[in-house]
Curated annotation (Swiss-Prot):
This is Probable endonuclease 4. Zn(2+) 2 binds at residues 145, 179, 216, 261. Binds 3 Zn(2+) ions. Endonuclease IV plays a role in DNA repair. It cleaves phosphodiester bonds at apurinic or apyrimidinic (AP) sites, generating a 3'-hydroxyl group and a 5'-terminal sugar phosphate. One of its GO terms (molecular function) is deoxyribonuclease IV (phage-T4-induced) activity.
Length: 292
């Protein structure tokens, strides 16, 4: 079964996010548990935590289908010691907030070398940051997002993700989130069924589907292999509908949060409905195969 939603607002308190997900017909969602453009935030109150859990239950959404995103300020591969420690502290705080809310996943961008250290050293530093975070906060799984490779951001090659995972001590607490726009901009073609099969086979060979914990479903304003991160509404960009139809019909993408970050929020309900229709067709075809 497919679990599809969007990165919804948590304005007024994290407890509002499940309600906002229900309003667009979602059975999964993403959120920020604090202001993503500030280093520090007030601690979550007991009232807010309890209300979030209650609203999540009322929404009929399981915690494992929620994909929180950390602050954009965090750089777990920062080349400078003071800034690295600041990022690590903020990341541990983000993990702690997820634990308080009963959420088992935290999605994050890996980091940037800022032209001050070698990319390989930066990737190793990111893995070290993850290991330290795991030692500080129990249980929550750290989910590395692939990037478009804009600027000095790492994580745009599947090999980057694999190198980080290889250096993480507790493999049960690391996974990846693949953003379709980022992958396309980084040189992984998704425009046809054949292209999807090739790109996803490469992902499976280098990283492995066992590490896929979530996805961001975005079309791309940016050109193929441009290394530019520009999202677009589904079907309105340079990727097109075929990539998303492919995902909906492939059971390797079952039971993980599939999250829209597309640019026109007024289209989210329509986009979710269309994806869900393809998913239902795939499920019916699978059931027909089982009974024949």
């Amino acid at each position: 079964m497919k679990y599809i939603g969007a990165h919804v607002s948590a304005a007024g308190g994290v407890e509002n996010a499940p309600k906002n997900a229900v309003a667009i017909g979602a059975n999964a969602f993403a959120l920020f548990t604090k202001n993503q453009r500030q280093w520090k935030a007030k601690p979550l109150t007991e009232e807010s935590i309890a209300a979030f859990k209650e609203n999540l239950t009322e929404a009929g959404i399981e915690a494992r289908h929620v994909l929180p995103h950390d602050s954009y300020l965090i750089n777990l591969g920062h080349p400078e010691a003071e800034a690295l420690e600041k990022s690590r502290g903020a990341f541990m705080d983000e993990l702690g907030r997820c634990a308080q809310l009963g959420l088992p996943l935290l999605n994050f961008h890996p980091g940037s070398h800022l032209k001050k250290i070698d990319p390989e050293a930066c990737l190793d530093r990111i893995a070290e940051s993850i290991n330290l975070a795991h030692g500080s906060v129990a249980d929550v799984i750290t989910v590395i997002e692939n990037t478009a490779g804009q600027g000095t951001n790492l994580g745009y090659r599947f090999e980057h993700l694999a190198r980080i995972i290889a250096a993480v001590e507790d493999k049960s607490r690391v996974g990846v989130c693949i953003d379709t726009c980022h992958a396309f901009a980084a040189g992984y073609d998704l425009r046809t069924v054949e292209a999807c099969e090739k790109s996803w086979a490469e992902f499976d060979r280098i990283v492995g589907f066992k590490y896929l914990r979530g996805m961001h479903l975005n079309d791309a304003k940016s050109e193929f292999f441009s290394r530019v991160d520009r999202h677009q509404s589904l079907g309105a960009g340079n990727i097109g509908w075929e990539a998303f139809r492919y995902i909906m019909k492939d059971d390797r993408f079952d039971d993980i949060p599939l999250i829209l970050e597309t640019v026109d929020t007024s289209l989210w309900q329509e986009e979710i409905k269309k994806l869900q229709q393809w998913s239902v067709v795939e499920w019916r075809e699978l059931e027909k195969t089982k009974t024949s």
